[in-house]
Amino acid sequence: MSATKLDGNLYRDEIFEDLAQRVAALKEKGITPGLATVLVGDDPGSHSYVKMKHRDCEKLGINSIRKDLPADVSQEELERVIEELNNDDACTGYIVQLPLPKHLDENRVLELIDPAKDADGLHPINLGKLVLNEEAPLPCTPNGCIHLLRRFGVELDGAKVVIIGRGVTVGRPIGLMLTRRSENSTVTLCHTGTKDLAAETREADVIIAAAGKAHMLTADMVKEGAAVLDVGVSRVDGKLAGDVAEDVWEKAGYVSPNPGGVGPLTRAFLVSNIVERAEKLAAQ
């Protein structure tokens, strides 16, 4: 068998069509949402990704503000930029592209973001609200994962889901989201301390690979017909590579390509968070 392709580009276009209508309605009220990005350093992948986010904004009629900083930027200067965006009424919400260079205090930077403007849903307050099941901006990549699975009819209620990777952007928050009553999945979070990863993944109905280790998930680790999301990003010979090996496509029932799977939906739900906040401001 050959797995069904979980095509994020197709679903992204559906979401963008809805967002474009909502942005147009906001503009009729004199409100134009604005998304800002803060990018530190010259990583080609990060620059490409941020460029796509601004292209999305242009397509949808959303203002975009880009703050590109050198790799050796000081903590003080970065914090000044964060404060500037917190106070900028033209900025509905913004993201700090992660990871940051090691000399910068990433947690401190995330804490300084105005939680209401946290377009990535990664501020400690917003993650805390996720734990408490309170309304807050949701982390974009986990939200994209769940919507992609639902869009293609993958059952989550009662499903055994194995997550590989415990990073703050995907692994930790998606476990919280999948155990909400709206998803009702049974979640196992695997990481470098997991003694027998293959034993866990072979029992999974859904596998979310977010380890950042190229091609680490192979066909012998996957149950026949399982759904597999490839969220990991690493580099092999200078090229971007996902966590899922090619042979998984012949055994799984559903596989998201990388790129072209979850990534487009990460961007879609980033913009969605901005539009939702603009709508709330308009209703005040």
UniProtKB/Swiss-Prot annotation:
Binding locations of NADP(+): G165, R166, G167, T192, V233
GO BP term, pick one: tetrahydrofolate interconversion
Keyword Methyltransferase included in the entry's annotation: no
Entry keyword set: Amino-acid biosynthesis, Histidine biosynthesis, Hydrolase, Methionine biosynthesis, Multifunctional enzyme, NADP, One-carbon metabolism, Oxidoreductase, Purine biosynthesis
The protein's Enzyme Commission number: 1.5.1.5, 3.5.4.9
Pfam families: THF_DHG_CYH (PF00763), THF_DHG_CYH_C (PF02882)
Pathway of action: One-carbon metabolism; tetrahydrofolate interconversion
Catalytic reactions of this protein: (6R)-5,10-methylene-5,6,7,8-tetrahydrofolate + NADP(+) = (6R)-5,10-methenyltetrahydrofolate + NADPH; (6R)-5,10-methenyltetrahydrofolate + H2O = (6R)-10-formyltetrahydrofolate + H(+)
Protein family (similarity comment): Belongs to the tetrahydrofolate dehydrogenase/cyclohydrolase family.
Protein name: Bifunctional protein FolD
Lineage of source species: Bacteria, Bacillati, Actinomycetota, Actinomycetes, Mycobacteriales
